């Protein structure tokens, strides 16, 4: 289990990843599937890409095989 400080650090790191991903996905216009993230990580990416606008995120699959699909709406 993560401490509060670890969660804050991870959230900041994932916010940067989401910003980068949003830019790249908008640039290339191809949906991207991200695997290997726990529910906390997926939620942070969902929230950050939603805040950027112009992106659609969707979790697919079940359990340890759950993945995040991201596509540009532009």
Short names for language-model regions:
Residues 1-74:
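RNA-contacting regions in translation and RNA-metabolism proteins
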